[in-house]
Amino acid sequence: MKVLVSACIMGTNCKYNGKNNKNLAAVNFLKDKEVILICPELLAGMEIPRPCAEIVNGSVVDENGKNVDLAYRKAVSLALSKIQNEEIDLAILQSRSPTCGVNQIYDGSFTGKLTAGTGLFAKALKQRGYKVVDVEEIGNCFMEASI
């Protein structure tokens, strides 16, 4: 099984704050899988660390009020290009991110409040027919049976 995975989940320090979201449940799940690490922001050459960004009225804006939507959309395009010739069975993406969030994203108020929504890369993958799951679903018992 070939699995596309947000690089931060596997311990790559590529989050906006220079840290990672290493998830041991995901690491264990992926032990016997072929893994393709992806970080759209890293592919696009975004700085690490960089200002926090959220989706505000459909556009990505950073915490300083700067519209960074074009940079994030470029990042998604680069990530899609990187995987275009891959036969990916599953994508496991980081929760809440304006790029990779699957079920929820931050609401754009920069207060930590969540709302139902999908990040730009997760949305693009779903639109192209990929099976996309939130990393937080990895611990659910039903997941392995459904893959």
Regions found by a protein language model. Name each.
Residues 43, 52-55, 59-82, 113-147:
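Divalent-metal-activated hydrolytic enzyme cores
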Residues 79-109:
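N-terminal glycine-rich phosphate/adenylate-binding segment common to multiple enzyme folds
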Residues 22-35, 75-90:
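Short amphipathic alpha-helices and their capping/turn segments at secondary-structure boundaries
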Residues 11-18:
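Short N-terminal binding/cap micro-motifs at the start of the first secondary-structure element
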Residues 21-62:
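Short, surface-exposed acidic-centric catalytic microdomains
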Residues 11, 45, 98-101:
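Short, active-site-adjacent cap segments at secondary-structure transitions
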Residues 1-4:
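Extreme N-terminal starter segment of soluble prokaryotic enzymes
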Residues 8, 94-97, 137:
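Short, well-ordered beta-to-alpha junction loops that form the rim of enzyme active sites
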